Amino acid sequence: MSPRAARRLLVLLVVAALAVLVLAPTVKRVLRDITLPLQYTSVIRAQAHAKRLDPALIAAVIFAETKFDARTSPTGALGLMQIEPSTAQFLAHRSGATTFTLADLADPAVNIAYGSYYLRYLLNRYGQSETLALAAYNGGETNVDRWIERAHAAGARFTLSSIPFPQTRAYVARVEHAQASYARDYGL
């Protein structure tokens, strides 16, 4: 290789290295935004504060339910946090909402408020256990009550591995993983 070609190659390598250094944070941020999206941060933070919840938990539930892409599920659950109509009516009654309609759940702020209210309710019901609250959010309170009874009857503690529904067990693990990621990557 000629000295002139070697210099060109060296300059090219230096420019490439600088480009990588400059673009790496942007690429990392873009990849994070694709693989771990986050929207409605101010609503999430406000609801977390109002309901005494970890904002990363709210974001993780939204991620597990819809990846921040609101849509109606085949079961009829609504909005970002996929709230079942019967659960929404229960929450509206319990919270004293007087003008609530199911259509309100299409509004991300309302949906996050109701989903956060439900998470707080479940955490209170299950002794602040996020595992139990998340299992109930996904698998239903009646099922969780039954699973707790079975575990206690067997003289065991209820743990993630105690959940007999593979979908619910995977859901809880997915939310817990996403919660840690939101706390780490977004500082929630």
Segment roles from a protein language model:
Residues 1-5:
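N-terminal Lys/Arg-rich, disordered targeting/topogenic segments
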Residues 7-8, 174:
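Basic side chains
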Residues 8-26:
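Hydrophobic membrane-insertion alpha-helices, especially the h-region
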Residues 23-188:
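Catalytic glycan-binding domains that act on GlcNAc-containing polysaccharides
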